[in-house]
């Protein structure tokens, strides 16, 4: 079986999504060790940078600088990775050989992910406060969180493509009719979502515990908080990506 077909098998997709849960939780744990440090998200005089010809936030600055390097090595040529910033250089490596499993598309919700992360997720996983000495470490952790969230949410395209290929005629009718509600009804699996939330809660509860004293309740991260981030944002945003991808599937 080809690599393309393997990546679109639902059991392989679910396995990838489960591994991504681990990455997201560990990245949240890393970010939780630092206070909110709101200045790293502010622009201009409200922020923490004093650079000539740059008026943006520290987070946006480092994000763009890092993504420029990643772009050079083809990270964003992969159907699993999407940049948060623009004006990136062309890869210095040749184009990938072989066929990608996804239909060509321009779906990228990273601007929405970035806004939600700063305004909603950071306040939930970090405590109030400012630690100037750890601004750099804070933003490095932020970027890891953003990258893992983006990968998880955009992986919905693989789910959508797999479901489309399983019943193309049904999806073609819904797509041609621009029946968003009908598409949503087809892609939703409430029982699976509930299993995901229970698994996430269990992982966050245990990953946050001190290995030296596993009976002690975790104070590193709130498991209810992690599950709520998935329920209120990650899952709904993944559905949005799936729908947007399918609506463009026949173009």
From Swiss-Prot:
Residue positions binding L-tyrosine: 74-75, 134, 136-137
Keyword Metal-binding included in the entry's annotation: no
Annotated Chorismate mutase domain residues: 1-251
Transmembrane stretches, start-end: none
Gene Ontology terms: biological process: aromatic amino acid family biosynthetic process; chorismate metabolic process; L-phenylalanine biosynthetic process; tyrosine biosynthetic process
Subcellular location: Cytoplasm
Binding site for L-tryptophan: 134, 136-137
InterPro entries for the chain: Chorismate_II_sf, Chorismate_mutase_AroQ_euk, CM_AroQ_sf_eucaryotic, CM_II_prokaryot
Catalysed reaction equations from the record: chorismate = prephenate
Cytoplasm in keyword set: yes
Keywords associated with the record: Allosteric enzyme, Amino-acid biosynthesis, Aromatic amino acid biosynthesis, Cytoplasm, Isomerase, Phenylalanine biosynthesis, Tyrosine biosynthesis
GO MF annotation: an example: chorismate mutase activity
SUPFAM superfamilies: Chorismate mutase II
Activation and inhibition: Each dimer has two allosteric binding sites that can bind the regulatory effectors tryptophan or tyrosine. Can bind either one tryptophan or one tyrosine, two tryptophan or two tyrosine or one tryptophan and one tyrosine, which differentially affect the catalytic activity. Activated by tryptophan and subject to feedback inhibition by tyrosine. In the presence of both tryptophan and tyrosine, the enzyme is in the activated state.
Entry GO CC: cytoplasm; cytosol; nucleus
Pfam families hit by this protein: CM_2 (PF01817)
Domain of life, source organism: Eukaryota
Entry's EC annotation: 5.4.99.5
UniProt subunit comment: Homodimer.
Job description of the protein: Catalyzes the Claisen rearrangement of chorismate to prephenate. Acts at the first branch point in the aromatic amino acid pathway where it steers biosynthesis towards phenylalanine and tyrosine, and away from tryptophan.
Protein's name according to its UniProt entry: Chorismate mutase
């Amino acid at each position: 079986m080809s690599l393309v077909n393997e990546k679109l098998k639902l059991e392989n997709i679910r396995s990838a999504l489960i591994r991504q849960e681990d990455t997201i939780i560990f990245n949240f744990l890393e970010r939780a060790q630092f206070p909110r440090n709101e200045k790293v998200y502010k622009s201009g005089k409200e922020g923490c940078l004093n650079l000539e010809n740059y008026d943006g936030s520290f987070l946006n600055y480092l994000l763009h600088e890092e993504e420029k390097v990643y772009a050079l090595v083809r990270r964003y040529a992969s159907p699993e990775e999407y940049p948060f910033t623009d004006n990136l250089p062309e890869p210095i490596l040749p184009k990938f050989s072989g066929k990608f499993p996804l239909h060509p598309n321009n779906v990228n919700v990273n601007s929405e992910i970035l806004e939600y992360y700063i305004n909603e997720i950071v306040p939930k996983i970090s405590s109030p406060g400012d630690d100037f000495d750890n601004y750099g470490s804070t933003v490095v952790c932020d970027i890891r969180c953003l990258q893992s969230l983006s990968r998880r949410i955009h992986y919905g395209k693989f789910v959508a493509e797999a479901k489309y290929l399983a019943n193309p005629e049904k999806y073609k009718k819904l797509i041609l009719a621009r029946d968003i509600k009908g598409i949503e009804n087809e892609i939703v699996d409430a029982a699976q979502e509930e299993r995901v939330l229970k698994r996430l809660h269990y992982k966050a509860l245990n990953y946050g515990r001190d290995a030296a004293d596993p009976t002690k309740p975790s104070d590193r991260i709130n498991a209810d908080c992690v599950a709520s981030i998935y329920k209120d944002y990650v899952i709904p945003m993944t559905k949005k990506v799936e729908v947007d991808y399918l609506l463009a599937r026949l173009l």
